[in-house]
Amino acid sequence: MVIRRDVRGVPHVLGATDPDTAFGFAYAQAEDNWQLIEDAMPFYRGNSAVYSGMDGAVTDYLVKWLGLWETVHENYKWDLSPDTRAYVEAYADGLNFYAATHPDKVDESKLPVTAKDVVVGHMLRHLLFYGFDGVVREVNKAERQRDISTPSEAVAVPADAKEITLGGLPIGSNAFAIAPHFSEEGATRLAINSHQPTTGPVAWYEAHIQSKTGLNVMGGLFPGSPSISVGFTENIAWGATVNRPDLVDVYVLEVNPDNEYQYRLDGEWRDLERDEVDIKLTLWGFLPWTVSREVLASEHGPVSVSYTHLT
């Protein structure tokens, strides 16, 4: 495996196999963005509050309420192909190798990084990127924010669509392609103009990864991602924009008046799944504390108790 950097410092990683390349890809990212990657680990693991106190408790509860780690533990070997597992495991190994060779730059308490850390990080990042956290905040308000919808074929439109216009034209992230016959030199071009910050955990990081078994892609990603998020290969190029696709369904459950832990489904009262999660905190920077909270789930997914209904 070889890492070469061009005049702009962009890493070009060449490996014999895809896992070789993933190892080098992780190492190159760690060289440039170790602190960002390390700081994100507690967030994905649901133990941010150990390091940041009460500020991290809300996201820790979210991770545990969604059952992300239970999902990964149960399905890691079945939902991910052997090739994919080998790739993310090699990626985690690359991060750990960097940590082992730079002990003065790492926090040992957050190591080692595992392949499941990488997978859960990818899962949680995507949820937040399309606005799932906004839905969670909405259903936990004191009053219901919207009526129960009925089946419709209408296209979902963001509520603030009219506010994000300038001169009648939409503004924000965009991507556009130019076909060869519209280009003076006959080239195909793609402008990936997603509006991201220039620094921080969601600033684009550029890289090129290639293996001798077929992998060859260049583009941008967020630090800590095992794959290229926007970019191009020899045959295809793609971009992405930040938007609000309608990917979350919220159900209002009918609760048994005689048993608050039962809800109606298909004409029958069903028991809610009940569990208790522990959230570990460090208060005032030195005092360890553990808070226990009940989490509920129905056949539809995680349950939140709000405005006298279960959702």
Predicted regions and their residues:
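A short alpha/beta connector and helix-capping loop motif
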Residues: 204-210
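Short acidic-hydrophobic surface loop/beta-edge motif
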Residues: 3-5, 176-182, 207, 229, ...
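Conserved small/polar residues in nucleotide/adenosyl-binding loops
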Residues: 1-2, 308-311
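A short secondary-structure junction signal
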Residues: 200-203, 249-251
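Compact, glycine/acidic-enriched structural inserts
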Residues: 223-283
